[in-house]
Amino acid sequence: MKQLMLYCRQGFEKECAGEIQDKATQLEVYGFPRVFKNAGYVLFECYQDGDADKLARELDFNALIFARQMFAVAAEFTELPSEDRISPILAELGEIDAFPVCGDLRIETPDTNEAKELLKFCRKFTVPMRQALRGKGLLLAKENAKKPVFHLCFVASGHCFAGYSYSHNNSRFFMGIPRLKFPADAPSRSTLKLEEAFHVFIPREEWDTRLSSGMWAVDLGACPGGWTYQLVQRSMFVHCVDNGMMADSLMETGQIKHHMVDGFKFEPDRKNVTWLVCDMVEKPARVAHLMGEWLIKGWAKETIFNLKLPMKGRYDEVLQDIENLKTFLIENKVKFKLQAKHLYHDREEITVHIQVLSNISPH
């Protein structure tokens, strides 16, 4: 197996390609990315047979910013007959000894308007395909979350890629996209960005301790309150920092304090803030440095923030800002865990999460 499939946001194929090239090289896997403009995916072509499996196993999926999902490609089918798509797939995969027995099946498409027209077909195709794979011993009789995931990605009605991902090193979401519903009472759609970030960055079993009621949070650039809404829904108390107006529905909860000041000048009077969130429209380097300042001063224990991306050089900007932030924290002897992702609800921006692992007294 020489190909690795990576899903990404349409229009960000170049950034996804640059990232997988860098990450593969770090693992001494050599090859080149095959980029299709606005396709919503990138194919990384490895020179060595078996290297796609190595990447699927060893390349930390959570370390990828622009990829929503990745899987090793075992076979590509370009002219599947509409009357019988299953038989050619089974015949080809039956010849591949290295294909693992899988515990789940996902029949997906890239996230483009053209490809998503195939989703109705994918849903209908799933049941007979699942039965056929089980009959051939390629899929277990019962779903098993510990086994690899079988992926079929259709880019056209007769054109698909078949492969697998490892359950410990993939996105657990169909197409790599969490399915979230916009709350009718939320002040803005930006609320879904923070909700998705919680799903992606924080294990569900840790929500009760890391996103618990009674915590204090700070929201920089809060107006009108899309991100604050998520914190209030979790029964937190929030310092909302913005010169604009907050939604009346949030003010009426009694859980927020509105500070009409510049987010870059605000200092919390309370020293028990757990969460710092920030979605300010500012230069990404400036926002990243501000987040670092808060963390080294012990003003917050965890932060989720967005970095707005420039029109050109987006990948380079991301690398530089994150590297500078890491260096700043390390120089100030802060132990931390950092993750970054181009979320489904992000557009020209990425979302970064940092958890401080050091015990820092606020100062």
Swiss-Prot record:
Q: Where in the cell is it found?
A: Cytoplasm
Q: Where does S-adenosyl-L-methionine bind?
A: 190, 223-226, 242, 262, 279
Which keywords has UniProt assigned to this entry? Cytoplasm, Methyltransferase, rRNA processing, S-adenosyl-L-methionine, Transferase
Instruction: Work out whether the entry's keyword set contains Transmembrane helix.
Output: no
Q: Which reaction does it catalyse?
A: cytidine(2498) in 23S rRNA + S-adenosyl-L-methionine = 2'-O-methylcytidine(2498) in 23S rRNA + S-adenosyl-L-homocysteine + H(+)
Active-site annotation:
308
Q: What is its EC number?
A: 2.1.1.186
Enzyme category, top tier = transferase
Q: Please name the GO terms of the biological process aspect recorded for this protein, alphabetically.
A: methylation; rRNA processing
Answer yes or no on keyword Cytoplasm.
yes
Q: What SUPFAM superfamilies does the record point to? A: S-adenosyl-L-methionine-dependent methyltransferases
State a single Gene Ontology molecular function. S-adenosylmethionine-dependent methyltransferase activity
Primary residence: cytoplasm
Kindly indicate where the leader peptide sits in this chain: none
Under PANTHER family, the record lists:
RIBOSOMAL RNA LARGE SUBUNIT METHYLTRANSFERASE M (PTHR37524), RIBOSOMAL RNA METHYLTRANSFERASE FTSJ DOMAIN-CONTAINING PROTEIN (PTHR37524:SF2)
Q: What does this protein do?
A: Catalyzes the 2'-O-methylation at nucleotide C2498 in 23S rRNA.
**Quaternary assembly:** Monomer.
User: Which family does this protein fall into?
Assistant: Belongs to the class I-like SAM-binding methyltransferase superfamily. RNA methyltransferase RlmE family. RlmM subfamily.
Q: What is the protein's name according to its record?
A: Ribosomal RNA large subunit methyltransferase M
